[in-house]
Structure formats: C-alpha cells, structure tokens
Amino acid sequence: SGKVRYVVKDLPLPFHGQARGAALAARCVAELGGREAYWRMADALFLNQAKLSAELIERLAGEQGVDPARLAACMADKKTAERIDADVQEAGRLGITGTPSFVIGTAKGDIVTGTLVVGAQSETAFSARIEDALKKAEASR
C-alpha cells in the first residue's frame, strides 16, 4: 500500500568485537552491490556472527559479488564510518541501546516519533503496532 517504510540502521554494539567491521562491510556491500546483495550479506553475517573475522567478512562480501579492493576502499572511507556513527547517535537519541530494536511511528525529516519495540516480537505484535500507527497518522491529517 506504500504506507509503511522499513528502514535499517546500524548499531554496532561495542562488546561485539567484529560488529563495527560487519556494519561497515554490510553498508559497503549495499553501496557496491545493491539491495539484494546487502540482504544476502546481512543474512550471512548473522548466520556466522559467532565466528566473524576480517577475513570471513571479506569472503562473505566476495560471495555477494563485491570486489575485495573496492570493499576495502569503501570500508576505509571516512564517509562510511560517519554514516554508521550518525546511526549510533540517532539510536541514542531514541533511547535504543540494543538490537533488534524498532521504532514504529512517523518520520518527519530527521525526527522520528512513535513506539519503541525492543527485542524479537511476533508478527501479530508488529501488525497491531503498525495498524495503530497508521490509524494515528490518518487521524492527525
């Protein structure tokens, strides 16, 4: 219906040693290989999170069709790191301290308002919160 937008933000937690490298790599795979490559990379990172290393992250990106030299350049680019840092700052403003976390509500520019949902939830729980947010948005028009 076009009424819902799903936005992924990075929140590499400091106690996960490879989290920042994984976030950088996933963001670079999206930039270099597109949306489908990003989702394949994200899935591979989650499936392998217990054994992530710089070498494995590079191999997984290669499996998504990303050239290792281009990946390394992207991951070393200050702009890539700044975008992840901005996501971390936004999470802090929203009170998000862990993953997975979701904000279901409305966004106007850089301002997001809504309900914070922390942790894995059932499809029913998400559906109810999304329907609630859609009703509130409709009523405020």
Task: Mark where each language-model region is.
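C-terminal cap of thioredoxin/glutaredoxin-like
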Residues: E58-R141
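Structural alpha/beta surface segment adjacent to cysteine/selenocysteine redox centers
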Residues: S1-G62, D132, K136-A137, R141
